[in-house]
Amino acid sequence: MLLILLSVALLALSSAQNLNEDVSQEESPSLIAGNPQGPSPQGGNKPQGPPPPPGKPQGPPPQGGNKPQGPPPPGKPQGPPPQGDKSRSPRSPPGKPQGPPPQGGNQPQGPPPPPGKPQGPPPQGGNKPQGPPPPGKPQGPPPQGDKSQSPRSPPGKPQGPPPQGGNQPQGPPPPPGKPQGPPPQGGNKPQGPPPPGKPQGPPPQGDKSQSPRSPPGKPQGPPPQGGNQPQGPPPPPGKPQGPPQQGGNRPQGPPPPGKPQGPPPQGDKSRSPQSPPGKPQGPPPQGGNQPQGPPPPPGKPQGPPPQGGNKPQGPPPPGKPQGPPAQGGSKSQSARSPPGKPQGPPQQEGNNPQGPPPPAGGNPQQPQAPPAGQPQGPPRPPQGGRPSRPPQ
């Protein structure tokens, strides 16, 4: 493809330079990017000015109606999006402005720029698809709309701005090795998948925020509040997930490892990042329907049980009595906090699944009063799902 583009560019340079001296002035110059675009068709038969030499990405896409953007070069962020039916101002590539972009009815866009070069301006007109983000680079702003999910950034790269509009996703996703952050937004928001081997964090709640469980040394952030808030990306494997969703649609950013989660924002505020591994998950999501993410691997109890008037109680961990069972209606459950293992505050509102049970068995939803042993407020995951919490 590159060779073909280069050859076309060379031919265009030789033939088009003479013809398009006059025409090129009328047209807005297009961006040069690695591959010059051949003259695109214009009103009558007018050859476009000479394309730039090879090694320069072409810039401007055709104008009018819907114009698909060319693929962005790898490793470079895409250029500015197109504008209505107005011809775009040409981008000036490094020292080599390309000839004017095609004008008139249909103008196919020139060849995409070679890798490592930013593409020219995106197409103009009603629909403007955003170019694909280059690999290894944070993507530009995600599409707008209440349903668009923020793009996942590549490992080690902060994610670009989340989609705009009702939903504002929280901060950057975790580094590589961490599952990405924000779940899709909209009526139902599934929680991000919990990392393997760790009980998932807080169960979803009604419109009431649950009082955060703050075990000593690892305070859990407050639960999300408001309508539908998709939870941010789940922490890396072995880490409990951070705070649940909050008002509006806001995906939560990934929590940094080894840090307790702060209180999540409320209402239309973006949620605080999730807590790192070894830390109890933040508050469960609240609001409309928030399905929780996938359950943890076998042998680990899943965090929040499903919502609904009835709250099934999860199996207690072996040898540890569980704290008080979940309560129906809008009753907050007072968790028994045995020394070294205080359970966080129970959920509130009609459908409040209890916090994550200890990892005894599949996905126990609510902890039960386990057999003789130490009365545990929140059951400790005997299998190492979660480190024991210091006494409050």
UniProtKB/Swiss-Prot annotation:
Residues 1-16 form the signal peptide. Sequence repeats lie at residues 53-72, 73-92, 93-112, 114-133, 134-153, 154-173, 175-194, 195-214, 215-234, 236-255, 256-275, 276-295, 297-316, 317-336, 338-357. It holds the Pfam family Pro-rich. One of its GO terms (cellular component) is extracellular region. The keyword Secreted applies. Residues 53-357 are annotated as: 15 X 20 AA approximate tandem repeats of P-P-G-K-P-Q-G-P-P-[PAQ]-Q-[GE]-[GD]-[NKS]-[KSQRN]-[PRQS]-[QS] [GPS]-[PQAR]-[PSR]. Keywords: Glycoprotein, Phosphoprotein, Pyrrolidone carboxylic acid, Repeat, Secreted, Signal. Residues 34-47, 325-334 have a biased composition (Low complexity). It comes from the Eukaryota. The modification Pyrrolidone carboxylic acid is found at residue 17. It is found in: Secreted. Residues 19-392 are annotated as: Disordered. Transmembrane segments: none annotated. Glycans are attached at residues 40, 87, 150, 330. Its main location: secreted. O-glycosylated. O-glycosylation on Ser-87 is prevalent in head and neck cancer patients. O-Glycosylation on Ser-330 has a 5 times prevalence in head and neck cancers. Proteolytically cleaved at the tripeptide Xaa-Pro-Gln, where Xaa in the P(3) position is mostly lysine. The endoprotease may be of microbial origin. The modification Phosphoserine is found at residues 40, 92, 150. Residues 48-83, 91-144, 152-205, 213-243, 252-266, 274-324, 354-392 have a biased composition (Pro residues). PANTHER family: BASIC SALIVARY PROLINE-RICH PROTEIN 1-RELATED (PTHR23203:SF20), PROLINE-RICH PROTEIN (PTHR23203). This is Basic salivary proline-rich protein 1. The gene is PRB1.
